[in-house]
């Protein structure tokens, strides 16, 4: 289990699936800057949901921009507009999350 509590078997599965950022599509390590390096992402911002449907890899730039925003809110941000990131352009794992994401998370 890594420091994000992702089991090793799931980490390997996700690394094989997500060879590029699930949001912007940049291939990891294709650019020399830190922003293109992979980072772990909870698509729905709930660290308790450790499933193949919620854990993904995205570039550090997208992860930093998304932060704790709801996915639907973030997709409408200036960052996403500038980079051409939309509900139609993201990876399939994100598209599936969008289909099931509640409009608001109640505590």
Question: What residues fall within each predicted segment?
Answer:
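Short, charged surface segments at domain edges that flank catalytic/cofactor-binding sites
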Residues: 1-25, 49, 81-104
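Secretory pathway export signals and precursors
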Residues: 17-20, 54-58
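Histidine-centered nuclease catalytic patch
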Residues: 25-57, 66-73
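Short Cys/His-based metal-binding microdomains
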Residues: 62
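Short, surface-exposed, polar/charged, turn-prone segments marking secondary-structure boundaries
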Residues: 65-71, 84-89
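Phosphate-coordinating loops and pocket residues in cytosolic domains that bind phosphorylated ligands
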Residues: 76
């Amino acid at each position: 289990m890594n420091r994000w509590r992702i089991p090793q078997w799931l980490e390997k599965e996700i690394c094989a699936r997500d060879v590029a950022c699930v949001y912007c599509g940049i291939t990891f390590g294709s650019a020399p800057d830190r922003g293109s390096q992979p980072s772990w992402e909870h698509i729905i911002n709930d660290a308790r949901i450790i499933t193949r449907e919620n854990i993904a890899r995205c570039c550090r730039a997208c992860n930093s921009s998304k932060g704790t925003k709801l996915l639907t809110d973030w997709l409408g941000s200036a960052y996403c507009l500038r980079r051409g990131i939309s509900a139609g352009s993201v990876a399939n794992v994100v598209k599936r999350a969008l289909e099931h994401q509640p409009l608001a998370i109640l505590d």
